Amino acid sequence: MGEVVNLSLSQRANHVLTHLYNNQESHIPYKKNQPVNFFNNVFLSTSKTHTGHTNYAPRALVFDLRYGLGSLNKHEYHETPTNFDNIPQSDRFNLDKQIAKNQYQQNLDKGIASTEAESILSVENTKFWTDYNKLIYSPSSLNTLQNYDIGQSPEYGSHHNFPQIKFNTFEVGQKEFSDSTSNLDSQLDSFRRLLEQCDLLQGVNVVSELDSAWGGFTTSLLTEFIDEYFNGGISNTKNSIWIYGLHSQGPSGRSSINEAISRIKTTIELSKNSTLFFPINTAPFSKGIFSSDTIEDNILRGEHERKIVNDIKLKSIDSSKVTDINSLGSIISNVDISAYYNMSAPKPQDSSSGYIDLSVPTTVPTKTSSKVINEYFVKNYVIPTEQGKLEEKFAFKDKGIPSNVYRSRDITSIIKVDTFPYKIFNSQKQFNFYSEFNVSTDYRIELKAYKDLIKNVRLNSQQLMGIIEDKAELIEDISHILEHYTISNEPSDEESDDDY
């Protein structure tokens, strides 16, 4: 099976990636005769020690704010630690920023099995993703920004020398990237080494944010990587580049006009730099069962411009009650993602719907016609391998809508890892669920709102001009995407674009 390289940018993204890699760590054979039942090389790179043992490391590049690595020193497992005992306190520099390791990490360093992880880990001692990370990263995989600190709040970083400047909008991220070009060569080299370690590259996963400057930074970084290693353009690459954009409303729960415009710009630019774009927080490993085509081909159905997967749901399974696709058990309630991923908690639906909706909600005011009806272009299900009986109950088909069903033996295993806070599902570790990823016309409502906002905004500040850059081009980009989420017989409420 082909390898996957992961790029993770931001503290939130790194929380998500850590759960992925902790799940991968649980598959590593630590005993000589232990059977290997997983393709560990997909997400992990391997190297042999002089004693013949195999080391596993994440096949990833991680980016964070300054001090975002928490208690982790990127070189500590690869160099002899410095002894500060004989250095006078007055000569020690910046040690006030040193963060002590929690008990869980201390146990890992000592080789003590953390059988009591549930009682050791808490919201209070897992502020950083490194507080419960279980794998050792290569130093070249860990990158921190030059000018922005993590600060007291995980939502936005602050400039190291000018704390009033926040790491909150698209153009700020672009500027930070351009100011850090001295690091670009090493980042390109690190990415190249990851690619060279692959025998058959399957694709690149990118986890970033929609609501901070990480969107601009990610766009600039991807532009360099794609130009250098993917034949000069996203349309020319034979590899998949899937981007997962983390959405939140910011510290106050409300967005300023600059932040709203920044979110629009980020969404459009990240979608342009991807072969599939998911405004969600995770992606289960999947294997097709009904088609020899790739997952990407199945979802796109030939419409490669309709790449934004806008409808995401997580549904519980109660096999004893399954009779059709709409009777799949009770609601997943009391979900508190924010406590563990530092994300906004999704709102559970009413008890009759049987799911929570992880789709990105409409984020700007909209004007919609009462005649508008939501229609699905394609529906996609990822089900647990052991739930094969679900296919006997129903074929996951919905009134002629093109549907794809994928099996994954990993989709429920993640909640069995000792670092996963399974109690957010108000359930035990044997909790079963499947996921649904759909593409529908509903996204055009959001796109129309984006277009209206950009058309009507006045470029009366340097910051807005920096975010939008070329207003006409941004409107054209939105219109281009909008075409592919609109059905031909839909009543048109479009206005002329001549007035921008």
Curated annotation (Swiss-Prot):
It holds the Pfam family Tubulin_3. Keywords: Mitochondrion. The keyword DNA-binding does not apply. The keyword Mitochondrion applies. One of its GO terms (biological process) is mitochondrion organization. GO terms for cellular component: mitochondrion. It is found in: Mitochondrion. Its main location: mitochondrion. InterPro entries: DML1/Misato (IPR049942), DML1/Misato_tubulin (IPR029209), Misato_II_tubulin-like (IPR019605), Tubulin/FtsZ_GTPase_sf (IPR036525). Involved in the partitioning of the mitochondrial organelle and mitochondrial DNA (mtDNA) inheritance. PANTHER family: MITOCHONDRIAL DISTRIBUTION REGULATOR MISATO, PROTEIN MISATO HOMOLOG 1. Belongs to the misato family. This is Protein DML1. It comes from Scheffersomyces stipitis (strain ATCC 58785 / CBS 6054 / NBRC 10063 / NRRL Y-11545) (Yeast). The lineage of its organism: Eukaryota, Fungi, Dikarya, Ascomycota, Saccharomycotina.
